[in-house]
UniProtKB/Swiss-Prot annotation:
This is Carboxylesterase 1C. It is found in: Endoplasmic reticulum lumen. Gene3D superfamilies: alpha/beta hydrolase (3.40.50.1820). The active site is at S221, E342, H455. It comes from Mus musculus. Glycans are attached at N79, N274, N304, N377, N478. Residues 1-18 form the signal peptide. It comes from the Eukaryota. Disulfide bonds join C87-C116, C273-C284. The gene is Ces1c. GO terms for cellular component: endoplasmic reticulum lumen; extracellular space. The lineage of its organism: Eukaryota, Metazoa, Chordata, Craniata, Vertebrata.
Length: 554
């Protein structure tokens, strides 16, 4: 019996595929963390996975509506093998988003908590050596109100491209954005959490096989917007070295355009908090339970009130357009892109409550433009001209619907991306643009057959979903391998090009870009006509100022 036990004990430390069977344990500045090894078919080196590693103290009590603080140290080996809870958010939408964009084979268990400042790490490195691999830090999307790190499995990207992948979480909704406009609650807690995670990466990622001097931040939708905020923020200096914004940038958003006093009067009424002073209101809101704040958040949605990133003089010293014009930002190489049909299916599905009878026609388009006109930086007087420009006398209802959805895709994603890319180029930044146009098989049964390149579709290919999920075609698998190679080459070198790949031109005065899909090819002047139309229209019709808007606060 003792011999049997001895044999098994010896096997437990016997190197197999270059690794012992013992799970990985890594030192961090707070203490040791225990992970797990996961092997991917075709790769000798397993990936070391660490889930739910804390990068800040739980933002509870007095730390609600306050800057994140470093995590408390621990003296034991912390188990980092389970997914962390997502930050506080609407559970129904959290499940929809998680199930829709997850690159996992299995449906993730849904856990939500205000204690949520954790990150996940996927490292293909031999942790017994100093590997100095490129690091890619993912910032999830979800409108800054829903989402989490764990649906995005970094296993395939990490193994195939030999990079360390980190997925981070940050406070959302009222927890991540509430601002009084003064020192009592300046706001931008979501972005301060993102910055805290990046500082943690600088201090710790070398022990996980990563190179802290080669960090790429990348994100989609509001994650892409967050990437651009961090690029424009002086607080981002030296925390990252390359950036990728997928389907979202900070240009033409509602950043800094909210009248804080008007919004907070509504929050005060909903919460029954005394708003006679900022300090009293913040203190009152800190006493509310998580469920009470969730209820308040739900009512804000009913009132069509959205909180936003603020021009606080710290995270963002000025309006994004001013920072870009002054060229006073982190001039790191940058990939900017969006998808062919950003409003193809998922976003209209999420806006069903705003669509009368689910129809998309001139009346609905006008309604939505009026609903979002302050966020879009347009005046209501412009709306008829905008609709006429896109419809151009078309009578067929199906074609009208398609053109209107294209219009919203341009307004929210395409035109801001081009404007940012031009500003980056003019500042001397190495810039690359793409348009993604492909229909993943994973969602083919959920959406109309005509939708190709919907919002978020590129995520499946960036994270190697065809290599993780069952049923992918050879074309999908090859497309994913190509996209991962582009993204990882950029993370390694600041240039996506490499051997065996279609050439991706740098975005210069010729405005060359890459169309990525079943056929991947170069093209020029992405959305040039649409940008020219909007630029001319805005010059003739400056946005109106109304009681619910203002330019900035300091």
């Amino acid at each position: 019996m003792w011999l049997h036990a001895l044999v098994w004990a010896s096997l437990a430390v016997c190197p197999i595929l270059g690794h012992s069977l013992l799970p990985p344990v890594v030192d961090t500045t707070q203490g040791k963390v225990l992970g797990k090894y996961i092997s991917l078919e075709g790769f000798e080196q397993p990936v070391a996975v660490f889930l739910g590693v804390p990068f800040a103290k739980p933002p509870l009590g007095s730390l609600r509506f306050a800057p994140p603080q470093p995590a408390e140290p621990w003296s034991f080996v912390k188990n980092a093998t389970s997914y962390p809870p997502m930050c506080s958010q609407d559970a129904g939408w959290a499940k929809i988003l998680s199930d829709m964009f997850s690159t996992e084979k299995e449906i993730l268990p849904l856990k939500i908590s205000e204690d949520c400042l954790y990150l996940n790490i996927y490292s293909p490195a031999d942790l017994t050596k100093s590997s100095q691999l490129p690091v890619m830090v993912w910032i999830h999307g979800g409108g800054l109100v829903i989402g989490g790190a764990s649906p995005y499995n970094g296993l395939a990207l990490s193994a195939h491209e030999n990079v360390v992948v980190v997925t981070i979480q940050y406070r959302l909704g009222i927890w991540g954005l509430f601002s009084t406009g003064d020192e009592h609650s300046p706001g931008n807690w979501a972005h301060l959490d993102q910055l805290a995670a990046l500082r943690w990466v600088q201090d710790n990622i070398a022990n996980f096989g990563g190179n802290p001097d080669s960090v790429t931040i990348f994100g989609e939708s509001s994650g892409g917007i967050s990437v651009s905020v961090l690029v424009l923020s002086p607080l981002g200096k030296d925390l990252f070295h390359r950036a990728i914004s997928e389907s979202g940038v900070v240009i033409n958003t509602n950043v800094g355009k909210k009248n804080i006093q008007a919004v907070n009067e509504i929050i005060a009424t909903l919460s029954q908090c005394n708003d006679t002073s900022s300090a009293a209101m913040v203190q009152c809101l800190r006493q509310k339970t998580e469920s009470e704040l969730l209820e308040i958040s739900g009512k804000l949605v009913q009132y069509n009130i959205s909180l936003s990133t603020m021009i606080d003089g710290v995270v963002l010293p000025k309006a994004p357009e001013e920072i870009l014009a002054e060229k006073s930002f982190n001039t790191v190489p940058y990939i900017v892109g969006f998808n062919k049909q950003e409003f193809g299916w998922i976003i209209p599905m999420m806006l069903q409550n705003l669509l009368p009878e689910g129809k998309m026609n001139e009346e609905t388009a006008s309604l939505l433009l009026r609903r979002f006109h302050s966020e879009l930086n347009i005046s209501e007087s412009m709306i008829p001209a905008v609709i006429e420009q896109y419809l151009r006398g078309v009578d067929d209802p199906a074609k009208k619907s398609e053109l209107i959805l294209d219009m919203f895709g341009d307004i929210f994603f395409g035109i801001p991306a081009v404007l940012l890319s031009r500003s980056l180029r003019d500042a001397g930044v190495s810039t690359y643009m793409y348009e993604f146009r492909y229909r993943p098989s994973f969602v083919s049964d959920k959406r109309p057959q005509t939708v190709e390149g919907d919002h978020g579709d590129e995520i499946f290919f960036v994270f190697g979903a065809p290599l993780l999920k069952e049923g992918a075609s050879e074309e999908e698998t090859n497309l994913s391998k190509m996209v991962m190679k582009f993204w990882a080459n950029f993370a390694r070198n600041g240039n996506p090009n490499g051997e065996g790949l279609p050439h991706w031109p740098e975005y210069d005065e010729q405005e060359g870009y890459l169309q990525i899909g079943a056929t991947t090819q170069q093209a020029q002047r992405l959305k040039a006509e649409e940008v020219a139309f909007w630029t001319e229209l805005l010059a003739k019709n400056p946005p109106e100022t109304d009681p619910t808007e203002h330019t900035e606060h300091k």
